């Protein structure tokens, strides 16, 4: 059964406490990545209704630090489903609830694999993108997947047709 991308949306909110920060009072990157992994896993599970495991995390760049006492908002949504894997796009914002403003902190792509009861990969539902953003993310997901597979040594560069097309247009 195909499912809408919007059906997988997870919004997670956390308050940055002293134990979450480094000596500069900024949210530690590892703590944010932990929260992002949870949000992405929940989005993947909503999509496939099965246990999932993290297969990969794309490059994460931290644009703006999130300070102690600020709020972290994480949005996670499945962008595309393949045979047993799903790409999840995450957007992260910080919010100063006292000053009443939000700012973008970062975004990333995670890949999850659905598992059957024996722990083996199992097929997942296809995604139906509806909004323009969902369609763009869906269309570009195959290129990102091929790059991940090449970097992980699971695909030869000469077999990456979508990726090669970027350089031959």
What are these regions (language model features)?
Residues 2, 16-17:
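Membrane engagement elements in two modes
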Residues 2-7, 27, 41-75, 79-80, ...:
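Hydrophobic beta-strand-centered segment that forms part of the acyl-chain substrate-binding groove
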Residues 6-12, 67-68, 79-169:
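HotDog/MaoC-like acyl-thioester-processing domains
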Residues 14-16, 47:
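Short, small-residue-rich loop/turn micro-motifs
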Residues 17-18, 63:
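Residue-level recognition of the GNAT/N-acetyltransferase active site
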Residues 21-33, 166-169:
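A conserved, well-ordered hydrophobic junction motif at loop->secondary-structure transitions
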Residues 32, 36, 40-44:
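Buried hydrophobic packing segments
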